[in-house]
Each structure stands twice: as C-alpha cells, then as structure tokens.
C-alpha cells in the first residue's frame, strides 16, 4: 500500500518527515546486533586483568550494550586475551565453533595478536588468527580498558558497515 504524501496537510507532511525513516531489514539487524554484543571472555594471561577492569564500575561495558557471557552458546563475540599455546589451540577452535552465527573475534594484546614476548617459543601460536578468523586487533602489552572499549566500538562500526553495504570487511 503506497501513501500519497501530496494529499496530506502541510503540517502532517512535516510531522511525517520528522518521524518516519526508510531503511532495510539488514540495516536494522546490523544496528541491533552492533548494539547488543555479548562477548565471551577467554582470558589466558595478564590481558585478562585489564578485561576484568572493563566490567568494573569505572568503565562499565554494560552501558554500551555488551554483557559478558561464560557460555559460547550465548555469545557472539570471543575476546581472546593472552598467550595461546599449541595445546590450547584446539580448545579455542572448539569454543569458536560452538558460538552461534554471526560471530566475531577480538584479539586483545600482543600475545593474542602475534605471540608477544613468547613468539620464539616452540609451544606458542604466533597469533590467534592462525586458529580462528579475527575481526579486530587491539595492540598493547597489556592494552588498557579504554583500548578494549575502543576495539569493541570498532567492531560495532564494522558490523553496521557490513549490514549497510553487504560487503565483508575481512575474509573469513
């Protein structure tokens, strides 16, 4: 059913222009997904201490619509913080596979992004992106809670952009 706006009174036209917007269902889903991220914490080292700081009252990640979950089946974001060893790699992959679609990964800290100071060890994975596809990298050793909030906001921008354009930013 089409609405003929020319037949309306000028005041009604002005009211409609202020209160009606047109969008696609994909953009609405992208907006909803980006504003209700539920990260699963996977803290393996000192970066996990900084991740706990984000949940405290000083930074309060809840105000951005993100609530930490302990189950991968209830999460859509995995935050990997710390050194991933080769023995731990299959567990990280299994948890990632248990997450429902759509799912995203944030690599927090230099250990998760590239192996950190333990990069030359035989037992350390040289970045979590060798196990799971990473969407956002947060550098630092350890990155502060504000950097994690910035990374989560960048992930939100990425989700909205992909919903708006239909293009994937990274190759998963």
UniProtKB/Swiss-Prot annotation:
It comes from the Bacteria. Keywords: 4Fe-4S, Cell membrane, Iron, Iron-sulfur, Membrane, Metal-binding, NAD, Quinone, Translocase, Transport. One of its GO terms (molecular function) is NADH dehydrogenase (ubiquinone) activity. Its main location: membrane. It holds the Pfam family Oxidored_q6. It is found in: Cell membrane. Binds 1 [4Fe-4S] cluster. It is an enzyme of class 7 (translocase). Transmembrane segments: none annotated. [4Fe-4S] cluster binds at residues 46-47, 111, 141. GO terms for cellular component: plasma membrane; respiratory chain complex I. Its cofactor is [4Fe-4S] cluster. GO terms for biological process: aerobic respiration; electron transport coupled proton transport. NDH-1 is composed of 14 different subunits. Subunits NuoB, C, D, E, F, and G constitute the peripheral sector of the complex. NCBIfam families: nuoB_fam (TIGR01957), PRK06411.1 (NF005012). This is NADH-quinone oxidoreductase subunit B. The lineage of its organism: Bacteria, Bacillati, Bacillota, Bacilli, Bacillales.
């Amino acid at each position: 059913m089409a609405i003929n706006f020319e037949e309306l009174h000028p005041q009604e036209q002005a009211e409609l222009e202020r209160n009606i917007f047109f969008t696609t269902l994909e953009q609405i889903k992208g907006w909803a997904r980006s504003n209700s991220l539920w990260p699963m914490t996977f803290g393996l080292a000192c970066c996990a201490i900084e991740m706990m700081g984000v949940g405290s009252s000083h930074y309060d990640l809840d105000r951005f619509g993100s609530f930490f979950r302990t189950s991968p089946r209830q999460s859509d974001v995995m935050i990997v913080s710390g050194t991933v060893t080769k023995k731990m790699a299959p567990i990280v992959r299994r948890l990632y596979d248990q997450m429902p679609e759509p799912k995203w990964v944030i690599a927090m800290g230099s250990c998760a992004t590239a192996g950190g100071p333990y990069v030359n060890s035989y037992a350390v994975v040289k970045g979590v992106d060798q196990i799971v596809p990473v969407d956002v990298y947060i550098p630092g050793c350890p990155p502060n809670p504000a950097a994690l909030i910035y990374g989560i906001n960048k992930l939100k921008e990425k989700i909205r952009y992909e919903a708006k354009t239909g293009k994937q930013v990274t190759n998963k």
